[in-house]
A protein has these predicted regions:
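Flexible loop and strand-edge segments within Gram-negative outer membrane beta-barrel domains
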Residues: 1, 10-84, 94-100, 133, ...
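Transmembrane beta-strands of outer-membrane beta-barrel pores
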Residues: 2, 39-43, 104, 111, ...
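Extracellular loop and loop/strand-boundary signature of outer-membrane beta-barrel proteins
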Residues: 4-9, 22, 90-96, 108, ...
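Residues on the lipid-exposed face of transmembrane beta-strands in outer-membrane beta-barrel proteins
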Residues: 19-25, 105-111, 189-193, 229-235
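Short loop/turn motifs that connect adjacent beta-strands in outer-membrane beta-barrel proteins
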Residues: 30, 112-122, 135-137, 196-202, ...
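Transmembrane beta-strands of outer-membrane beta-barrel proteins
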Residues: 33-35, 120-126, 202-206, 241-243
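Outer-membrane beta-barrel transmembrane domain signature of Gram-negative proteins
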Residues: 64-77, 138-252
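Short glycine/proline-rich turn/loop motifs
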Residues: 84-90, 167-172
Length: 253
């Protein structure tokens, strides 16, 4: 907690909210729908101008006696050789907030087509996933100083030279940006046929699939399309024949 500024905190914190539901609905005796929804909201608070990794690197690289946390003048300690004071970097440079949102949704519709032909059914699926992450940064600089003592021939301090760096800012600057974003959509349609005979069984299917991914940035949209036909025949639970044929295409926009 930043004790010098009561209006905000630089304490690391995470807030997460998850929501999920799964529905199985029988619309009619021959029509079923399945719906799956999942949502997530996440907020993360962290010190303003230094990441977790850089902070740990600074702690490992800084000698234990390089300078005090604060000088005798009450100013943050520092030096020209080691300018980053880990305590000051984590408590006096403001704070950042990240907002991440995730949505996962899919729907499956199954239709029995026994009225047209025994063993015939159709299936339709659609899915949509979305993710975005935005960052808000409220940052400022801080004043720090180095104290170098001049010693006489006996090793007794005679004078201290104080050199100040940086500047003390009272107001927080603001910056906001979209750090990451992607969307994924999927559509499938299938026509299935299944028939059991006295000594054999048959299954055949034809399926169309379209998959689209949109990432952050220009020319980062990918589209995939597939048409797949497959079949299975079993005789006496002993002899089997399978086949599959597919056509696929990919484009980048």
């Amino acid at each position: 907690k930043n004790t010098d500024q009561g209006s905000y905190s630089t304490q690391l914190a995470n807030s997460i909210l998850n929501v999920r539901t799964n529905l199985d609905i029988d619309i009619t005796s021959s029509t079923q729908v399945k719906v799956n929804l999942s949502g997530k909201l996440k907020e993360k608070y962290s010190p303003g101008s230094i990441s977790d990794g850089v902070l740990m690197e600074t702690l490992y690289a800084l000698p234990a006696n390089a300078y005090p946390v604060r000088s005798h003048n009450g100013i943050w300690g520092g030096s020209n050789m080691y300018p980053k004071n880990p305590v000051a970097e984590s408590s006096s440079t403001g704070y950042t907030t990240s907002h991440a949102r995730t949505l996962l949704a899919d729907l499956t519709l199954t239709q029995d087509l026994e009225a047209l032909a025994p063993g015939l059914s159709a299936e339709f699926r659609i899915g949509f996933d979305a993710y975005s992450e935005t960052w808000d940064a409220r940052s400022k600089q801080y004043l720090y100083e180095s104290n170098i003592a001049h010693l006489d021939n006996s090793g007794i301090p005679t004078d201290t030279v104080n050199t100040q760096y940086g500047k003390e800012e009272k107001q927080l600057g603001f910056n906001s940006w979209l750090n990451n974003q992607n969307r994924h959509s999927n559509i499938q349609f299938a026509l299935n046929y299944q028939k059991d005979f006295s000594q054999s069984n048959l299954f055949a299917s034809i399926r169309y699939k379209q998959d689209k991914n949109v990432y952050l940035g220009q020319y980062n949209t990918y589209m995939h399309q597939d048409i797949i036909a497959s079949g299975h025949y079993g005789l006496l639970n002993k002899y089997y024949l399978d086949f599959s044929i597919a056509a696929s295409g990919t484009s980048r926009l």
